[in-house]
Amino acid sequence: MRESQRLPFRPAMAALGLCIVTTGRMLARRTVHLPRRNVGRRLSFADGSTAVVYRETTVDRDKASDPCVLVVSFRLRWVRGWGWGHRLFRWESMLNTVLFVGFPGFVSKLWLAHDRNGVYRGLYEWDGPASAEAYVRALWWALIVVSEKDSIRHQVVPGIRRDAVLAGVGDVEPPAREWWNLVGVS
């Protein structure tokens, strides 16, 4: 993500703070869920990388009226290889749920383990591209704490639901050979 795209620090902290409060309310009402139907699926991307879904998060809400898919990627700053650092991050990442579930427009997230290049991805469904962009512009500040600055990227694909992307792999128009374009699911 270009630095010009991120929110200034104070508005980002305000947005993240409001999200945390909203998430707390949602957790108290038990409207946040961790279904297992996609856990273990291997997703392949147009850049040749693959990653396994290790967690899924959904919320109770009406179907998105303006669906879009958001893909976010980053590489952890101090963790390399396939060892305990990645396992620890995947375990601890559950705590990061409070940083996205309460944002307006959130529908669902697939959490993808690191690929062969050490890159993690989140594959989200969001209600409204503007809401997805607002979220990711605030998220930059949380990611920069643990990520290599130049590795933080995102792509919003409007007009499509996450499950449609999973079912109709490669249907993104125009076809793109990019890090975010899903080309296979197993």
Regions found by a protein language model. Name each.
Residues 119-125, 129-178, 186:
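Short, Lys/Arg-rich amphipathic alpha-helical interaction segments
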Residues 106-107, 150:
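Secondary-structure boundary/capping positions in well-ordered alpha/beta enzyme cores
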Residues 1-105, 158-186:
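Short S/T/G/P-rich N-terminal loop/turn motif that feeds into the first structured element of a domain
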